[in-house]
From Swiss-Prot:
Family: Belongs to the bacterial ribosomal protein bS6 family.
Protein species of origin: Shewanella sp. (strain W3-18-1)
Descriptive protein name: Small ribosomal subunit protein bS6
Keyword presence, Metal-binding: no
Keywords: Ribonucleoprotein, Ribosomal protein, RNA-binding, rRNA-binding
Transit peptide listed as a keyword: no
HAMAP family per UniProt: Ribosomal_bS6 (MF_00360)
Signal sequence, start to end: none
Pfam family, one: Ribosomal_S6
Region (Disordered): 98-131
Gene expressing this chain: rpsF
Function: Binds together with bS18 to 16S ribosomal RNA.
InterPro entries tied to this protein: Ribosomal_bS6 (IPR000529), Ribosomal_bS6_sf (IPR035980), Ribosomal_S6_plastid/chlpt (IPR020814), Transl_elong_EF1B/ribsomal_bS6 (IPR014717)
Protein backbone atom coordinates (compact mmCIF):
# COMPACT_ATOMS: atom_id res chain seq x y z
CA UNK A 1 0.00 0.00 0.00
CA UNK A 2 1.11 3.53 -0.70
CA UNK A 3 0.94 6.71 1.35
CA UNK A 4 -1.22 9.63 0.24
CA UNK A 5 -1.96 13.16 1.38
CA UNK A 6 -5.52 14.21 0.61
CA UNK A 7 -6.98 17.70 0.93
CA UNK A 8 -10.55 18.51 0.01
CA UNK A 9 -12.52 21.73 0.19
CA UNK A 10 -16.23 21.74 0.98
CA UNK A 11 -18.82 24.41 0.13
CA UNK A 12 -19.13 26.69 3.20
CA UNK A 13 -22.93 26.25 3.31
CA UNK A 14 -22.36 22.50 3.74
CA UNK A 15 -19.99 22.77 6.73
CA UNK A 16 -22.43 20.92 8.98
CA UNK A 17 -22.11 17.89 6.68
CA UNK A 18 -18.31 17.72 6.98
CA UNK A 19 -18.21 15.31 9.97
CA UNK A 20 -20.45 12.87 8.07
CA UNK A 21 -18.29 13.20 4.96
CA UNK A 22 -15.14 12.56 6.99
CA UNK A 23 -16.75 9.49 8.54
CA UNK A 24 -17.82 8.19 5.12
CA UNK A 25 -14.40 8.73 3.51
CA UNK A 26 -12.45 7.28 6.45
CA UNK A 27 -14.83 4.30 6.38
CA UNK A 28 -13.96 3.66 2.74
CA UNK A 29 -10.27 3.67 3.63
CA UNK A 30 -10.52 1.44 6.70
CA UNK A 31 -12.81 -1.07 4.93
CA UNK A 32 -10.01 -1.58 2.39
CA UNK A 33 -7.56 -2.30 5.27
CA UNK A 34 -6.09 1.18 4.89
CA UNK A 35 -4.66 3.27 7.72
CA UNK A 36 -5.37 6.90 8.55
CA UNK A 37 -2.18 8.46 9.88
CA UNK A 38 -3.41 12.04 10.24
CA UNK A 39 -6.83 13.68 10.02
CA UNK A 40 -7.26 17.43 10.46
CA UNK A 41 -10.40 19.49 10.04
CA UNK A 42 -9.11 23.01 9.37
CA UNK A 43 -12.57 24.56 9.33
CA UNK A 44 -13.63 27.48 7.16
CA UNK A 45 -10.78 29.40 5.60
CA UNK A 46 -10.43 32.24 3.14
CA UNK A 47 -9.77 31.17 -0.46
CA UNK A 48 -6.88 32.66 -2.42
CA UNK A 49 -9.28 33.34 -5.28
CA UNK A 50 -13.06 32.94 -5.70
CA UNK A 51 -14.36 29.51 -6.71
CA UNK A 52 -17.96 29.51 -7.99
CA UNK A 53 -18.33 33.05 -6.53
CA UNK A 54 -17.35 31.75 -3.07
CA UNK A 55 -14.64 33.36 -0.96
CA UNK A 56 -14.45 30.74 1.81
CA UNK A 57 -14.40 26.96 2.00
CA UNK A 58 -14.20 24.26 4.67
CA UNK A 59 -10.84 22.43 4.46
CA UNK A 60 -10.03 18.85 5.52
CA UNK A 61 -6.58 17.20 5.42
CA UNK A 62 -5.97 13.44 5.59
CA UNK A 63 -2.76 11.42 5.42
CA UNK A 64 -3.56 7.81 4.66
CA UNK A 65 -2.02 4.53 3.64
CA UNK A 66 -4.32 2.70 1.24
CA UNK A 67 -4.44 0.69 -2.00
CA UNK A 68 -4.61 2.63 -5.26
CA UNK A 69 -8.11 1.28 -5.97
CA UNK A 70 -9.38 2.83 -2.74
CA UNK A 71 -7.89 6.20 -3.66
CA UNK A 72 -9.58 5.99 -7.07
CA UNK A 73 -12.87 5.27 -5.28
CA UNK A 74 -12.34 8.33 -3.06
CA UNK A 75 -11.57 10.55 -6.06
CA UNK A 76 -14.78 9.34 -7.73
CA UNK A 77 -16.73 10.12 -4.55
CA UNK A 78 -15.21 13.63 -4.49
CA UNK A 79 -16.08 14.15 -8.16
CA UNK A 80 -19.75 13.21 -7.72
CA UNK A 81 -20.26 15.11 -4.46
CA UNK A 82 -21.50 18.61 -5.34
CA UNK A 83 -20.45 19.92 -1.91
CA UNK A 84 -16.75 19.21 -2.64
CA UNK A 85 -15.40 22.26 -4.47
CA UNK A 86 -11.83 21.02 -5.00
CA UNK A 87 -9.70 18.07 -3.98
CA UNK A 88 -6.07 17.13 -4.24
CA UNK A 89 -4.52 13.70 -3.77
CA UNK A 90 -0.72 13.44 -3.66
CA UNK A 91 1.32 10.29 -3.25
CA UNK A 92 3.99 10.60 -0.55
CA UNK A 93 7.03 8.47 0.19
CA UNK A 94 6.40 8.08 3.93
CA UNK A 95 3.51 8.36 6.35
CA UNK A 96 3.17 11.87 7.74
CA UNK A 97 1.88 11.79 11.31
CA UNK A 98 2.99 15.06 12.92
CA UNK A 99 0.68 18.06 13.02
CA UNK A 100 0.58 20.24 9.92
CA UNK A 101 1.74 23.88 10.06
CA UNK A 102 -1.94 24.90 9.97
CA UNK A 103 -2.77 22.78 13.02
CA UNK A 104 0.35 23.92 14.88
CA UNK A 105 -0.51 27.58 14.24
CA UNK A 106 -4.04 27.01 15.54
CA UNK A 107 -2.71 25.23 18.67
CA UNK A 108 -0.27 28.06 19.36
CA UNK A 109 -3.00 30.64 18.88
CA UNK A 110 -5.34 28.73 21.20
CA UNK A 111 -2.64 28.35 23.85
CA UNK A 112 -2.05 32.13 23.88
CA UNK A 113 -5.71 32.76 24.60
CA UNK A 114 -7.21 32.45 28.04
CA UNK A 115 -9.59 29.69 29.10
CA UNK A 116 -12.58 31.61 27.72
CA UNK A 117 -10.87 32.04 24.35
CA UNK A 118 -10.02 35.65 25.11
CA UNK A 119 -6.58 37.22 25.19
CA UNK A 120 -5.66 39.26 28.19
CA UNK A 121 -5.36 43.03 27.81
CA UNK A 122 -1.55 42.80 28.19
CA UNK A 123 -1.25 40.20 25.40
CA UNK A 124 -3.45 42.19 23.03
CA UNK A 125 -1.64 45.43 23.83
CA UNK A 126 1.81 43.83 23.38
CA UNK A 127 0.73 42.44 20.02
CA UNK A 128 -0.58 45.85 18.90
CA UNK A 129 2.69 47.63 19.65
CA UNK A 130 4.76 44.80 18.18
CA UNK A 131 6.46 43.38 21.26
Amino acid sequence: MRHYEIVFMVHPDQSEQVPGMIERYTGVITEANGTIHRLEDWGRRQLAYPIQDLHKAHYVLMNVEAPAETIEELETAFRFNDAVLRNMVMRTKVAVTEASPMARARDERDSRRGPAGERSYDEAHAEEIGE
